[in-house]
From Swiss-Prot, chain A:
Keywords: Cytoplasm, Endoplasmic reticulum, ER-Golgi transport, Golgi apparatus, Transport
Role this protein plays: May play a role in vesicular transport from endoplasmic reticulum to Golgi.
Protein name: Trafficking protein particle complex subunit 2-like protein
Subunit and interaction comment: Component of the multisubunit TRAPP (transport protein particle) complex, which includes at least TRAPPC2, TRAPPC2L, TRAPPC3, TRAPPC3L, TRAPPC4, TRAPPC5, TRAPPC8, TRAPPC9, TRAPPC10, TRAPPC11 and TRAPPC12. Interacts with the heterodimer TRAPPC3-TRAPPC6A.
Intracellular or extracellular location(s): Cytoplasm, Perinuclear region; Endoplasmic reticulum; Golgi apparatus
Transmembrane domains' residue ranges: none
Family designation: Belongs to the TRAPP small subunits family. Sedlin subfamily.
Superkingdom of origin: Eukaryota
Amino acid sequence: MAVCIAVIAKENYPLYIRSTPTENKLKFHYMVHTSLDVVDEKISAMGKALVDQRELYLGLLYPTEDYKMFRKLHNSYTDVMCNPFYNPGDRIQSRAFDNMVTSMMIQVC
Amino acid sequence: MEAAAAAAAAAAGGGCGSGPPPLLLSEGEQQCYSELFARCAGAAGGGPGSGPPEAARVAPGTATAAAGPVADLFRASQLPAETLHQITELCGAKRVGYFGPTQFYIALKLIAAAQSGLPVRIESIKCELPLPRFMMSKNDGEIRFGNPAELHGTKVQIPYLTTEKNSFKRMDDEDKQQETQSPTMSPLASPPSSPPHYQRVPLNHGYSKLRSSAEQMHPAPYEARQPLVQPEGSSSGGPGTKPLRHQASLIRSFSVERELQDNSSYPDEPWRITEEQREYYVNQFRSLQPDPSSFISGSVAKNFFTKSKLSIPELSYIWELSDADCDGALTLPEFCAAFHLIVARKNGYPLPEGLPPTLQPEYLQAAFPKPKWDCQLFDSYSESLPANQQPRDLNRMEKTSVKDMADLPVPTQDVTSDDKQALKSTINEALPKDVSEDPATPKDSNSLKARPRSRSYSSTSIEEAMKRGEDPPTPPPRPQKTHSRASSLDLNKVFQPSVPATKSGLLPPPPALPPRPCPSQSEQVSEAELLPQLSRAPSQAAESSPAKKDVPYSQPPSKPIRRKFRPENQATENQEPSTAASGPASAATMKPHPTVQKQSSKQKKAIQTAIRKNKEANAVLARLNSELQQQLKEVHQERIALENQLEQLRPVTVL
């Protein structure tokens, strides 16, 4: 079901981005970038609603995810992080991560 | 080699095929053949074969070769009888009636050609060929041309690095094993000098033992290989140009390791760790981490493996392969696997797609059981899949597991993390789905091990999100000691089963200050709120925050992320003694409560909106409130006492 998977760094550049070849990759790159705006908007919201909103936004994504993707992604991401040879900010070149992403893109597609 | 072949071709072309053509052998072949000839001659009772009359004799023309050693040798080559007859004919033994050195050598070369699938012709032996292979019995470490009845089906592979790999492709059935051997042997960098190769021959039959289904494979090759280590080790030309002695020794050790790898790399199993390699790895492990049952942290391992001069992506991939449970640290079997992969890579082997079964931690622990590894054994047995193991490995694992289960300590963090995760309501529902989703892939053991850890990481994500939200700390409004804040802390304690452990991670145990954003927040909070405690708060924060940060990392084995989510009680108990030492006992331990409550309340509110308050919380709130008031008074008093001391000291310092 996933047609595009991207991991964005803090500095808004992609650490990892991959999309199924059927669609135009550029379009997905744009989409990812615009989604960053949505996240920023959520984060920058002021007031008490901030935490609630964000939690609703992100929190629901995680525990109640319909597609069991985020967890796997996050687990693989932490695996990559655990690797002492990985410098934060590098592109993600882990084969295990690639395999997991491939499996996710294939699985429900 | 090519010159010799060309010369032989020229000579053969010059002289027709009537008599045995002058044969120029390579140095390797020369040595090998002369040895074989000597054995035949010696076995025949003659002296070392130098002169033709001393050579063994074989009755020409007999269908079944005589019991002479030469005949035995030829039979040991496992060629059909007619081929052998052809060979004896071609080499000229039949013509001259005996096996002189020339005939013998030609015959050997023809045998090699026949074994390579080439037709038995004089022209065949003009090209480079592998050394002939003979079936040997495994009496002791030496080659014996035993009787056919004694042959146990083992094969001796005389390694022979040749440029003509295509000749390996055409093989008989029995040479199929060599087909896998030679491509893997060829990348080895050692020069094809014959004596070490030949000396390796009697030991190599140990390798074939492993390939065949005979038992007792492991001890003999390991023992046999040891005497070979010395001559090979001396020939290892380690680049000792590194200025640092440590690095020089390391580089030399890596090149020695390469030699060890040469000796011990089973032709078809380069991923098997031998005994010497194992010992070497264990010694290196000990140099990094004295306790063999503990871990090497990621940074230490990174520094160590970086010295191997492999590229970072490769090291990263090796780490990925070898760190089976992906915890950022290497246990002894993981370390051995990683080291072995590095050595293999340096020797030119391409890195495998997945961790080979002989390098998996369960296998390594089973193959080399040591009492110190009991805890890891238990860890692996609780999660290992037998599917990957070969039958004999399973037997060994079962034996060791039965032996060691009795001594095993309390379950490791994987199991405890399971318990912790059971507490999380939000994760539980996802658990069975995740486990059921994972198919039985070769990586199942890894994925299974990853599952418990994944649950702990799932909590991390929420927590991290919360923390990041709090990171720019805003000074809270002043008097914040309300019921809600106090209640939040108690809710943690009371609702520990129901509250996600993220809270506990966020809320560092009360006596110590929470990590990262908290010290700054706590400072601000204390400034705002408790003026009397102002002087002590920063110092306390400074004291406790390093203490708090140190505690998770100092907890053995160093797995800080997981440790953070241990049940709060345990963490609380751990924290309390540590901070008690830093400050006044009871007051200090209770002092951070208000500060923690304030900041945690802010952080908690978001989560608490999702949690329902019930009446127990209210009762606890009231109780806590009274307790806090009392402690506040005590802290006040201590602060006053400290200020007095400060006043007393001040005049002294001024002077």
